[in-house]
Regions:
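Extended catalytic/binding region for NAD+/ADP-ribose chemistry, centered on the ART fold
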Residues: 1-34, 38-40
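Active-site and NAD+-binding cores of ADP-ribose-processing enzymes
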Residues: 24-157
Length: 157
């Protein structure tokens, strides 16, 4: 298993990129707007960060697997996805930065094409900047935050 999260922001806007997405989509506002958990990772934590398209291509040279591995679709589709099991053996955590998320969410060019003719999956399904913690021992401390934030859907009047 793993733990998913989004970076706590202290910029006066939304508390996290996840809550920005929740508000923009009007997605379960009551559930996600009143409480959060904050944690700090150990300085020794091994973190795999994707901040650019080049970072993603470099990562996928070692940690890629076919999206439709052992499937009737494997010969039709050449998409590659991250091999999370393999990545989790070498890293404590994975971080997809906000910049990388937006750049590779729905790319309009061929930036995710590989030299072998395959293509890397985009990050559309991630919804926002994301952290995935594989090794919970890399958490130095954590705390519950009662947010006094009223998140309003963009669709409300």
């Amino acid at each position: 298993g793993c733990l998913w999260g989004s970076t706590l922001l202290h910029n006066g806007g939304y508390p996290s990129d996840w809550l920005r997405w929740v508000a923009s989509e009007g997605f379960m506002l009551n559930k996600y707007s009143s409480m959060a958990v904050s944690f700090k990772l150990s300085r020794k934590a091994k973190i795999c960060t994707i901040d650019t398209v080049e970072d993603y291509h470099r990562l996928m040279r070692k940690y890629a697997k076919p999206k439709y591995e052992n499937s009737e679709y494997s010969s039709l589709f050449k998409e590659k996805v991250i091999d999370w099991k393999k990545l989790s053996k070498d890293y404590d955590a994975f971080h997809l930065t906000e910049r990388a998320f937006w750049e590779m969410r729905l790319p309009l060019s061929n930036i995710l094409e590989c030299e072998d003719g395959s293509e890397l999956c985009d990050f559309y399904s991630y919804d926002c900047e994301s952290w995935i913690l594989f090794n919970l021992d890399c958490i130095n401390w954590g705390s519950v935050i009662n947010q006094d934030v009223k998140i309003k859907s963009l669709y409300d009047d």
